[in-house]
Amino acid sequence: MNDKTVTINSNSNTDNKKNKTWQPVRNGKTFIKYLGLNKKISEKDKENLIEDSVNLIGQTINPENIENTVLNSTGLCFGQIQSGKTTSMEAISALAHDNKFKIIILLTGNVTPLASQNTSRVDRALQGREWHVIKNLPRVPWNKSENVNKLKNVINSSLSENKVIAETFNKTVLILSMKNPSKIRRITELFNEVSSWNNSIYDKVPTIIIDDEADHHSLNSQSSKNQADDKDEDELYRVEINETWETIAEKFEKSVRDLKEINPEIPEDQELNPGDLINTEHKDIRTHAAIRDLRTVFNFHSFLGYTATPNANLLTNTLNFLSPNFSQILEPGSDYTGLEFFFCQQKYIDRYISPIEEKIRELEDSNERPKSLEDAFMHFVVSVACGYITGHSNEGNRSMFIHPDRVLESHDQYIKWINAIKMKWEGELKTDKNTEEYKDIIDCIKKSLEGIRDNADEKDEIPEFSETFIQHFKESLTRIIPTKFNAGRGGRIPEIEWDRDYAHLLVGGQGLDRGFTVEGITVSYLSRSVGTRQQDTILQRARFFGYHKKQKNFIKIFLTDELSDFFRDTYHSDRELRMSLKRHSENPENNLKDWPRVWISRNIGNYKLTRPGINNMWGVVSRNLPPPPAREGFAWKMRSIDI
């Protein structure tokens, strides 16, 4: 067996207290109503959604057992790329309301399209008088006085000793917010104003904070810069006689927990000695700091971090307030097409994956249009024409995305190429039918259609080649207009109006990196290089994952050989990670902080698990790195073994 293992063992004596599990009410009115309105989910998938939601809520704080949890209730919700994590957030919110949670805060999307997409879905799904909705989003006016009143109403009724009042006016505040520092600080300021800075009033108000894409922006990417060994002596604090963790923390207005986190080289149970040099300044990113400030408002809350790529969350220092102590593996629906669907066997790779030229960078640099791009676009236009003929255009979308690079100039280059291909084909289709140009383009269209038919499971979905098909191809070609899906220079990433047109072609970089759903994705062209070779970052570019089985006959994914190998290998490592976490969580007494940090992969030496700044011990973990020198009392160990 060629698999490799990277193991990181935590030997630190962290506070491994875990909330006791409890049995939530699963047949409450709001949850039942939500499930009933969700017509797109099959009964079998609803059963899985119910079980996942109940198990997850049952690991959070128990609203009927009020206690001071501070920052000790942090969950990892591990789904798959485009597998319905937003649906889980909706279900969790509905279930939380029925179980007497009074405040739910959803942090989602650091770019406008993603924030708008996800919050609008949640807003539509959670309609009803049981909600006071506060929107903290771009292009949505912030009515401070109205929001203060909404929050006060819920707080006052929930704290009322009159049970009739509390039950009659049973509302939950649902805050839908973009995840950026200023927006998060605005929420914190709102709660501070309502409490007149006496946040103890929230001690009896059960709260859930949901973090969408929890591995992105939320974590402290400056963590590795908190090493005392990497600083000059004048940047550190020298411990004086009789000083302790507690007295120094009080002196610098920090918690003992925070002080120990930024001094990871000192074992947590070790006392300080006079003359020791320690960190007192915490380097972190603004979003991370804003989330910490928001969480400290609530002594009685749970934090749920959703992600499909949890390497960074699992590698962050277990003393950090975002290090999870429980987890829930979210099962995808039966129509999901992801790593397993496309990459578990060679026959599926052969069917759905097409190669991009090995020298794609050289072609781009010389402005030479790649043949694979023409093949991809031909497949897309033929698929769109099929949709118009069969009537699929009346009920959904057919889309294509091109992701060449984060650099804006590359997006311009590919749009010019697509427009040039369009112009060339339109011209050839207008020539006399006896010309070689016309015969060549017709032959290409026919071969593409026959290729789709040959691979299709349902042949009747594929129309016959005919003059009618040629006319639909011409019209489809005209209607497809490529969209530059980036913010330009100082602008915004455009919001796509999926209902306005059937066919969409997006060319972008960052906007297509994570979270964003490309409706009706049919053809994907991912030519971007692996860059810094971070496994989680590359996996997030798989916008072709999702619920696409209904149009599997038309799906085609164009990848470089390197990316194709990456996704094939990642299928195995992702499966191993899920199985390991699932086994660990089967025992309700197990704390996720104690889970052995083990990653198994066939090709783990070629990729980094996550970005360097997250792991403040040795940074990025890779089999290619030499073992670090042994240090007495050090909190972490790393080794690489063959199995």
Could you say what each language-model-derived stretch is?
Residues S88, I92:
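Hydrophobic positions on the alpha1 helix immediately C-terminal to the Walker A/P-loop
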Residues K102-P138, K179-S182, R406:
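Conserved Walker A/P-loop ATP-binding site and its immediately adjacent core
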Residues W131-S145, P206-I209, A214, S224-N226, ...:
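Conserved C-terminal RecA-like helicase domain
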Residues K135-L137, V205-D211, N220-K231, H282-T390, ...:
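Conserved P-loop NTPase catalytic core
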Residues E146-I210, S218-K231, H282-L294, G508-G509:
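Conserved RecA-like ASCE ATPase "motif II neighborhood" in helicase/translocase motors
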Residues K231-S255, D276, E281:
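Primarily a LysM-type cell-wall glycan-binding module
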Residues I353-I442, K446-K459, F545-H548, D561-I643:
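C-terminal helicase lobe and adjacent C-terminal extensions/tails of nucleic-acid helicase motors
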Residues G488-D565:
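Conserved RecA-like P-loop NTPase helicase motor core
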